[in-house]
Amino acid sequence: QKKRKHIKERDNYLCQICIRELYGTKRKYNSEGLQVHHALPINLSEDLKLDESNLITLCSMHHSMCDKGQIPYKEVKNIIIEQNQK
C-alpha cells in the first residue's frame, strides 16, 4: 500500500504512457483509474515485487496493454529508469 502510493507520487499521479503520448493515448494528463504495474510480472520476479525499478504508474488501458504484451517490456523499463533518475 505504501509502495503503491510512493510510486504514484514519483510518477506525479499520471499514467507514464499517456504523459508521453504513446500507444493510443486519449488524454496526455491522465490521472484517472491509475494502477501500479509490475514491468516484469511477479510470477517471473518475486524478488522485484516491491522494487521501484520494476514499478510504474499506468492507466487501466495501458496497464491492460502491457499485460497483453502490446507495449514492449524494454520500453516500459526505460520509462521507469527515466522516472527513477528525476
Please name every model-derived segment.
Residues 1-35, 59-61:
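Short cysteine-rich loop/turn motifs with clustered Cys
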Residues 2-5, 53, 74:
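Generic alpha-helical secondary structure signal
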Residues 20-25, 55-77:
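Short Cys/His-centered divalent metal-binding micro-motifs
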Residues 26-41, 70-76:
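Short cysteine/histidine-rich zinc-coordinating motifs and their immediately flanking basic loops
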Residues 40, 64-65, 85:
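Compositionally biased, intrinsically disordered low-complexity segments enriched
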Residues 40-55:
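Short linker/helix segments within small regulatory modules
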Residues 76-86:
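Charge-dense (acidic/basic), low-complexity helical/coil segments
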